[in-house]
Design a protein with these regions (language model features):
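N-terminal loops that bind phosphate or other acidic moieties
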Residues: 1-186
Length: 186
């Protein structure tokens, strides 16, 4: 079994950046999108939105459950619960996108050891995503710079994983057959 959470909605990368910033005490400007198509005013609005969300949660940075409550994000709350339940069941989770990865980090703060069950499907250019992957010490399977979330990178990574498993299975079968043939000759 392998679970791939995805998120869908507006403002989720801002929510992820605010959660990450509050949890790690990272400045909002270091978490705002680096998209070169943004104007200075758009980038400033992004920083302001992250800052305002972080301010709302400012007293909760040391307590991850309180941080989730203060954030008011049902999507983040659901994703953290999803990751925690998967970990309790010892089921690997292929996190994809900024919010899912940040929620994996929040889950790690709630239940240390969670990271052992987390795998990163891909790395987006979002600063909060990059930093969350680093904090979790994950190695992304793909580097597509996808910003869509929604599990898209997870599905693509799953295809790559299935192909790798097939290749390894074929190699193991061939080696086993060769060993068996050699044993039959002796």
């Amino acid at each position: 079994d392998l679970l791939i959470p995805g998120e869908l909605g507006e403002g989720l990368s801002t929510e992820a950046a605010a959660l990450f910033g509050t949890l790690t005490k990272t400045e909002p400007a270091a978490l705002a999108s680096l998209d070169t198509s943004l104007t200075t005013q758009q980038w400033q609005r992004d920083v302001t939105a992250i800052r305002d969300r972080m301010f709302r949660c400012r007293t909760a940075h040391a307590e991850p459950l309180e941080l989730l409550t203060e954030s008011g994000s049902p999507v983040a709350q659901a994703l953290v619960g999803f990751v925690l339940q998967a970990t309790a069941r010892r089921t690997p989770v292929l996190v994809d996108g900024c919010l899912a990865t940040v929620c994996g980090l929040v889950a790690e703060k709630i239940a240390p050891g969670t990271r052992a069950w987390l795998y990163s499907s891909q790395l987006s250019p979002e600063p909060a995503h990059i930093q969350a992957v680093q904090k979790l010490e994950l190695t992304p399977l793909l580097a597509f710079d996808l910003t869509t979330g929604q599990g898209t990178g997870g599905v693509l990574a799953l295809s790559a994983l299935n192909a790798a498993i097939e290749l390894v299975s074929d190699e193991v079968y061939a080696i086993t057959e060769a060993i068996n043939a050699q044993n039959d000759d002796t």
